[in-house]
Amino acid sequence: MYRLPADQKLKCTEFMSITEATEAKAIQYLKDASWRTDAAVDNFYSNPSNFANKFDKKAIETIFNKYKDSGEEQISEKLPEFVKDININDEMMELAVLWKFKTKQMGVITKNEFMETMERLRCDNISSLEKQMETVRQQLSSKDLNNNSAFKEFYMFVFDLGKAENQKNVSLQMCIELWTIVLKSKFDNLQIWFDFLNKHHKLAISKDTWNLFLDFVKIANDSITKYDSEGAWPVLIDEFVEYYKENCK
């Protein structure tokens, strides 16, 4: 048994649960990936030597064909059925499925995205994918944002998913909808943030503001008094802190 700090031990357990690898191999891959569980898992599954059994690519295509649109090489119309079959029943995990499949469009998984992801995850049946997504659920549901690289990557992905075609920013309404899904259980003052935006901003949100808002949430969850207005924060977040101090004391 290896002696590890609590956070690394948790990641090691998660890695072993997903891959069924030994503890020694889990530690090796996690160290190589700077203890980022998702990256370590991807690297593990990218190495054919880790698998004694032949991977059934035809089985993946059979699964894809079950859910694909009529006349289209994508899953869209039957996406709700697909996520239900892998035991996904909430909006955050529906977005998490798109994240794991590295989709480029909201509500659509192309054939290439599906085939490449299922092979990368070494899933050639629905039950193994369901197991993978349950581990993702555990990662994303943690309220410890300071030690959750998986949630940060998921959060940043969601912004790109929300962009309209040929747009760099995301509309305020779309951002509010997405923030509600991904942060409603992680930031107690989320509704105050929305009230501020609707009263004083009303404009699209930039990627920089979206990303840095997560860093702000980490501070505000501890104490908003620890916010340093002299730091390299977007003006919008500076203005929100002033709004909060004036209206929420």
From Swiss-Prot:
SUPFAM superfamilies, sorted: UBA-like
Signal sequence coordinates: none
Sequence ranges assigned to domain UBA-like in this UniProt record: 4-49
GO CC, any one term: ubiquitin ligase complex
Domain of life from the UniProt record: Eukaryota
UniProt key word Secreted: no
Keyword Protein biosynthesis: no
Keywords for the protein's UniProt record, in alphabetical order: Ubl conjugation pathway
Gene Ontology terms: biological process: protein neddylation
Entry GO MF terms: cullin family protein binding; ubiquitin conjugating enzyme binding; ubiquitin-like protein binding
Function summary: May contribute to neddylation of cullin components of SCF-type E3 ubiquitin ligase complexes. Neddylation of cullins play an essential role in the regulation of SCF-type complexes activity.
Protein's UniProt name: DCN1-like protein 1
Lineage: Eukaryota, Amoebozoa, Evosea, Eumycetozoa, Dictyostelia
